[in-house]
């Protein structure tokens, strides 16, 4: 019998379950990358909405304006839909506040909507919910760009568009994390989700390149094209997304991976049915250490989360307060608030900062800003690998936050020395800023949302994810707004604000870091059995 072709041998070397998981991994990666792709254009177009005008440019503009009034031909004439140094109403001296308000409108709506999104999403099929969000997001992203073609100069139009877009985009994150959590267990979760979460940076890079291609010639297309891409991916989602392995008769890894230790984020694994069969088994020492309120054997009642169930079906939706009682949710949520403040300030203001400091045009500044996201890809993967190896999520985040603050100070100083220095600091800053943000929004959220007391309840995963990312989105809304208010007084003040935010993020993890470092390893130490009450 002839030997099978190499390609066929490769295909059959993997099981049916593995192929399905790879498909879901890639599909959810592309779906959320398209969300981020649609968020990036506003930061690229800022440099075009208010152009960097030199004294010669302003004199040229006045000369052409006088020629138009006298009826003579002008050697340089601006289009009718542009004014002196940009697009009204962003051509005035208060342009930074107006641009900051656009960011705040989107991000504030996103933060508020995220809390509601988890509650709504856990009661609707993920595929339908996500499809609706992507189609609506594509429509409102494109609507912003239509302001260029229809010569719209109403500030209210752009604000309302941003608000609605922010609300509908909240359908994305809880949905894709829940879907991925259904398909992948806890083994090597930091690495898997670190690689998967690079969709954030990939989406930002693609968004920068696509928006930058048209920003100087027809900035409306910088929004219309990404909007069309998101809508198209929404159709792909509707046609191909599989919410749970059981839907295609695949095994669920959430059931098979039952290792006592998960990651040191203080989770109590309790459920009545499990207690009946395992009540004589000892707790993992680190879990025990994280759950002891005074270190003497007493367990805080608020750390016990027991869901009503029907013998383990895992279909009951956890309440908002119930999710908050899961140890670690509040601390990581508040940490993410400040970590996301830093990340989104760079997302929305970095191209304009490069334009002002290095005096590059909007297209080149947008292309250069992608290096921050390239660094973010490596930072997210590195954080996942380290946290998997050390089995300490909070400590990994804390170390990167500790290094990020002085790096931002160096960035603010070195970036003024030339293009080469800017490139190096963009890569390093991107890695350190995005690492903790990536780890918390993916591996930590999935760990907390699938702790054993919930018995793999995807509804709970959606709620926990929404709480953590929703709290982080409050910081994402504040960061760009504060940057818009502080930047007129000097970019150095913006960087001081970012360094302070990193310090605050680290502060909220101190208790968890102390618990992780003071606990014995997972294979040693005294073990205390937990008795059913």
From Swiss-Prot:
Recorded GO MF terms: glucose 6-phosphate:phosphate antiporter activity
UniProt keyword annotation of tRNA processing present: no
Annotated CDD domains: MFS_SLC37A1_2 (cd17344)
Keyword annotations: Antiport, Endoplasmic reticulum, Glycoprotein, Membrane, Sugar transport, Transmembrane, Transmembrane helix, Transport
Record InterPro entries: MFS, MFS_dom, MFS_trans_sf, SLC37A1_2, Sugar_P_transporter
Biological processes, Gene Ontology terms: glucose-6-phosphate transport; phosphate ion transmembrane transport
Keyword Glycosyltransferase: no
Tissue: Expressed in numerous tissues, with highest expression in pancreas, kidney, bone marrow, spleen, liver, small intestine, as well as in fetal brain, liver and spleen.
Function: Inorganic phosphate and glucose-6-phosphate antiporter. May transport cytoplasmic glucose-6-phosphate into the lumen of the endoplasmic reticulum and translocate inorganic phosphate into the opposite direction. Independent of a lumenal glucose-6-phosphatase. May not play a role in homeostatic regulation of blood glucose levels.
Name the UniProt record assigns to this protein: Glucose-6-phosphate exchanger SLC37A1
Organism: Homo sapiens
Gene name tied to this protein: SLC37A1
């Amino acid at each position: 019998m002839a030997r099978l072709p190499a390609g066929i041998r490769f295909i059959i070397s993997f099981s049916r379950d593995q192929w399905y998981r790879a498909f879901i991994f890639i599909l959810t990666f592309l779906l959320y990358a398209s969300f981020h792709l649609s968020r990036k254009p506003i930061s690229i177009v800022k440099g075009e909405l208010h152009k960097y005008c030199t004294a010669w440019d302003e004199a040229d503009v006045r000369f052409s304006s006088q020629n138009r009034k006298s009826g003579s031909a002008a050697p340089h004439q601006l289009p009718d839909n542009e004014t002196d140094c940009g697009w009204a109403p962003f051509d005035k001296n208060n342009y930074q506040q107006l641009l900051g308000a656009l960011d705040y409108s989107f991000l504030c709506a996103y933060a508020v909507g995220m809390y509601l999104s988890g509650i709504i999403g856990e009661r609707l099929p993920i595929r339908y919910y996500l499809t609706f969000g992507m189609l609506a997001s594509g429509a409102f992203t494109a609507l912003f760009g239509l302001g260029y073609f229809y010569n719209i100069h109403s500030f209210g139009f752009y604000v309302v568009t941003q608000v609605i877009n922010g609300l509908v985009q909240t359908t994305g994150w809880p949905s894709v994390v829940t879907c991925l959590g259904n398909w992948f267990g806890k083994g090597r979760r930091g690495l898997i989700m670190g690689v998967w979460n690079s969709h954030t940076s990939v989406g930002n890079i693609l968004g920068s390149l696509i928006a930058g291609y048209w920003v100087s010639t027809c900035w409306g297309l910088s929004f219309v094209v990404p909007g069309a891409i998101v809508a198209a991916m929404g159709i792909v989602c509707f046609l191909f997304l599989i919410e749970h392995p059981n839907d295609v008769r695949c095994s669920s890894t959430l059931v098979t991976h039952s290792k006592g230790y998960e990651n040191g984020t203080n989770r109590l694994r309790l459920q009545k049915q499990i207690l009946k069969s395992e009540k004589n088994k000892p707790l993992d020492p680190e879990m025990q250490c994280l759950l002891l309120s005074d270190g003497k054997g007493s367990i805080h009642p608020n750390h016990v989360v027991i869901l009503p169930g029907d013998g383990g079906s895992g279909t009951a939706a956890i309440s908002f307060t119930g999710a908050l009682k899961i140890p670690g949710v509040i601390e990581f949520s508040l940490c993410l608030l400040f970590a996301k403040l830093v990340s989104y300030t760079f997302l929305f203001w970095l191209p304009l900062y490069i334009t002002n400091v290095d005096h590059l045009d909007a297209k080149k500044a947008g292309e250069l800003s992608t290096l921050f996201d390239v660094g973010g890809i490596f930072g997210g993967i590195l954080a996942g690998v380290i946290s998997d190896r050390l089995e300490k999520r909070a400590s990994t985040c804390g170390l990167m936050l500790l290094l990020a603050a002085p790096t931002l100070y160096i960035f603010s100083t070195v970036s003024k020395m030339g293009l080469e220095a800017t490139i190096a600091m963009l890569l390093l800053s991107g890695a350190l800023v995005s690492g903790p943000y990536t780890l918390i929004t993916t591996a930590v959220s999935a760990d907390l949302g699938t702790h054993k007391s919930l018995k793999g309840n995807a509804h709970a995963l959606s709620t926990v994810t929404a709480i953590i990312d929703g709290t982080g989105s409050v910081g994402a809304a504040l960061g760009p707004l504060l940057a818009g208010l502080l930047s007129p007084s000097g970019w150095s003040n913006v960087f001081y604000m970012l360094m302070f935010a990193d310090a605050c993020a680290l502060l909220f993890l101190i208790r968890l870091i102390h618990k992780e470092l003071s606990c014995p390893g997972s294979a040693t130490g005294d073990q205390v059995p937990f008795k059913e009450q």
